Amino acid sequence: MGYGDADTDLLLGNPLHLRAVLEAPEYRGMPVVLLHECYPYTRQGGYLAAVYENVYLDLSYGIPLLGYGEMLAFTRQALGVAPISKLMYSSDGIVVPELHWMSAIDGRRVIGEALGELVAYGEAILTEAEAAGESVLRGNAIRLYRL
């Protein structure tokens, strides 16, 4: 629960509160997928994905409450903190099928733009950015969910 849930204290939505659970021996082997990019705590979610082997960060692009610029901002944050192998695309589409379609368009566009910036800044080469895009949009979910 978090952004968009009026009955939630957003301060309690910080994923760093999960550290005790993530460090518990009985949960270390269980994959944990942090949904909705932990918005507005994307950096913290990315940090958890970076330091815990079993934690992944889902980037949801169908949230109708966020505009393109904000989706691009949290995608940049996620790419700056989390390993590419721990990031996954999600449509977050609900109820109306068109939301999945709109999300797919926005998701590809935002991920492509953010990865393109990494190439422009010299932080990645084009083939690395293309491979990263494939991983985030498809490959990581296939591996994690054994599809």
Model feature map: region roles:
Residues 1-89:
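Catalytic pocket-lining loop regions of alpha/beta-barrel enzymes
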Residues 3, 95, 143:
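Active-site micro-motifs of SAM-dependent methyltransferase domains
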Residues 57, 92, 141:
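Conserved, mostly hydrophobic/aromatic
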Residues 60, 90-94, 112-114:
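Short, loop-centered acidic/histidine patches that primarily coordinate divalent metals
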Residues 67, 94, 123-126:
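Alpha-helix capping and helix-coil boundary motifs
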Residues 84-86, 101-147:
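Mid-to-C-terminal alpha-helical segments outside catalytic/metal-binding sites
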Residues 96-100:
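Short active-site-adjacent structural elements
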